[in-house]
Amino acid sequence: MPIKTIFVPLSDAEGAAKTLNAAIGLAEGFGAAVNVVHLRADPTQALGDFVGESVSPQLVEEVLTQAEKRATAIAAAARKAYDAAAKTAKGVKLSYSESTINSDVAVETQGRLSDIVVVRRASGTRDVGARVVAEAALMGTGRPVLVLPTTPPAKIGTSVVIAWNDSLEASKAVNAALPFLTRATRVSVISANAESAIDQKGIIAYLGTHGVKARGVSVKAGADAGKAIVSAATRAKANLLVMGAYSHSRVREMIFGGVTEHALSSARLPILLVH
């Protein structure tokens, strides 16, 4: 499926400029539109720390006031980043809006009406906003999610590494990545073998039917397949890693599998994930 609509949810202003510029760069290459939605925080969420405690009305009012000021400042910064990025866009249709509903719902609703979702990687364990957005996009949209590192490369998808293990998730990821793969100048299929080698002939032949010439590479996984894959992608000088997202879901909480978690936390290149 061609990429014609790119969705960029912004939970805050951190990294917004780089995320937007990367999305616009993709849109220019694919001839796509970019839909940006700022997910404005609900000030009442700031009261969560006081649940079960006896607090004065004055303290509640003060907490809400400060939370609203912070939300307003973040919204202004996000809009400023969008306006600056929009000025550099060349022939790209852009739209910007602000959502005050639950961020999960907003991401899922808009993401399902897009061809790909572009988000930034969480900068650490305390970067809850970015983590929530990425999880909602992966678990609730049914769309491929492009997770960007802190500093995205100037070009994304010219040199691609596919993490292949013959799984359903990996198969979905490859299919979703075809718009990138058919434009790439170099494609490598990497399998991290723990015990027995994974047959890559089938996936390489499949890619060939789409005009994609790929080479197969096998690496020893050892005790950490995620580390082996990321290291191999780095050695290949890839600017895009394609992989399935492995997880265990508990109601609305997502627990990533080891390979996915390592890639998300340590890879310094964009990762296209499909759950």
Tell me the role of every PLM-derived stretch.
Residues L20-A22, V105-P153, T234-H275:
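Gly/Ser-rich helix-loop-strand patches that form or flank binding pockets
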Residues Q58-A76:
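A short acidic, glycine-rich active-site loop
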Residues M1-P2, G15, A41-T44, K69, ...:
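Structural beta-alpha unit
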Residues F50-G52, V161-I162, V230-A233, G257-G258:
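Short low-complexity, flexible loop/linker segments enriched in glycine and/or proline
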Residues M1-E62, G140-R143, T150, I156-K220, ...:
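Small/aliphatic-rich secondary-structure junction motif
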Residues T125-R126, A194-I198, A221-A223, S249-R250:
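Short, small-residue-enriched loops and turns at beta-alpha junctions
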Residues G25, A81-A84, T109, A136, ...:
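Alpha-helical scaffolding segments of alpha/beta enzyme cores, especially the outer helices
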